[in-house]
From Swiss-Prot:
Changing Q156A: Almost loss of activity with L-rhamnose as substrate. The active site is at S146 (proton donor), Y159 (proton acceptor), K163 (lowers pka of active site tyr). It comes from Azotobacter vinelandii (strain DJ / ATCC BAA-1303). Changing D200A: Retains 16% of wild-type activity with L-rhamnose as substrate. One of its GO terms (molecular function) is nucleotide binding. The lineage of its organism: Bacteria, Pseudomonadati, Pseudomonadota, Gammaproteobacteria, Pseudomonadales. Belongs to the short-chain dehydrogenases/reductases (SDR) family. Transmembrane segments: none annotated. The keyword Mitochondrion does not apply. The gene is LRA1. The keyword NAD applies. This is L-rhamnose 1-dehydrogenase (NAD(P)(+)). Pathway: Carbohydrate degradation; L-rhamnose degradation. NAD(P)-dependent dehydrogenase that catalyzes the oxidation of L-rhamnose to L-rhamnono-1,4-lactone. Also shows high activity with L-lyxose and low activity with L-mannose and L-fucose. Can utilize either NAD(+) or NADP(+), with a strong preference for NADP(+). Catalyzes the first step in an alternative pathway for rhamnose utilization that does not involve phosphorylated intermediates. Keywords: NAD, NADP, Nucleotide-binding, Oxidoreductase, Rhamnose metabolism. Disulfide bonds: none annotated.
Length: 256
């Protein structure tokens, strides 16, 4: 197992990519903090995941911490330290993607998206990094960015800048935190079938068109991200920092 004796915080872990990542981290021996929004749906999803992890002999706790709350990172770190004594890995996954056209973008929607996807992430990364520095044995931070950090989207003008920002944050943090042995990397999912884009993918014609652009011939699934995230969290990636890993079935190179 790759993550034995490590404590891993995963934000947005009640469903989708975060859920798959948290589950696989637990399978690899980690003690997992399942971060969720605090909503009834988020709480239910996180608790069911904690039960699933316990069923195969893993260890996990569920913690409500809305990613839009700039203090959520401190809350997650405090919960991890209280329950498990340390923070070794942060997987910053929480994010929203409400599609909307540019010219009539509501200011509130823009601010909510940036607040959740980028501002919340910044301070969560900071909180985890401070704890890792204090512990004195390094650590790993993985941000779930997106292929949207590299390509535009007419209905995502409020979303793509946040994902580009996450990628840039990991690159800068790799430099800032390298002296403390803290590695910072980003994974860039392509089109992954999750709740966040369920409505967009419900159009079968559009779904088929999107699938046809992927060289591997299918859309991604949350579990497709779990392995790359575990790799970057583990000591197998001990000399990997400031990197960006596309997990898109070849979509980006095909778009080029």
């Amino acid at each position: 197992m790759l993550l034995i004796d490590k404590t891993v915080i995963v934000t947005g872990a009640s469903r989708g990519i975060g859920r798959a990542a948290a589950r696989e981290c637990a399978r690899q021996g980690a003690r997992v903090v399942i971060g969720h929004s605090g909503s009834d749906e988020g709480r239910a999803g996180a608790l069911s995941l904690a039960e699933e992890i316990a069923a195969f002999g893993g260890t996990a706790i569920a913690v409500g911490a809305d990613a839009a709350d700039l203090d959520s990172g401190e809350k997650l770190v405090a919960a991890a330290v209280e329950a498990f004594g340390s923070v070794d890995v942060l997987v910053n996954n929480a994010g929203i993607c409400p599609f909307h056209s540019f010219l009539d973008m509501p200011r509130e929607l823009y601010l909510k998206t940036v607040g959740t996807n980028l501002n919340g992430a910044y301070f969560t990364v900071q909180a985890a990094a401070r704890r890792m520095k204090e512990q004195g044995r390094g650590g790993a931070i993985i941000a779930v960015s997106s292929i949207s950090a590299l390509v535009g989207g007419a209905m995502q003008t409020h979303y793509t800048p946040t994902k580009a920002g996450l990628l840039s944050l990991m690159q800068s943090c790799a430099i800032a935190l390298g002296p403390y042995g803290i590695r910072c990397n980003a994974v860039l999912p392509g089109t992954i079938a999750t709740d966040i884009n369920k409505e967009d993918l419900s159009d079968l014609e559009k779904r088929e068109r999107m699938t046809s652009r992927v060289p591997l011939g299918r859309l991604g699934e949350p579990d497709d991200l779990a392995g790359p995230i575990v790799f970057l969290a583990s000591d197998m990636a001990r000399y990997v920092t400031g990197a960006s890993l596309l997990v898109d079935g070849g979509l980006f190179v095909n778009l080029q």
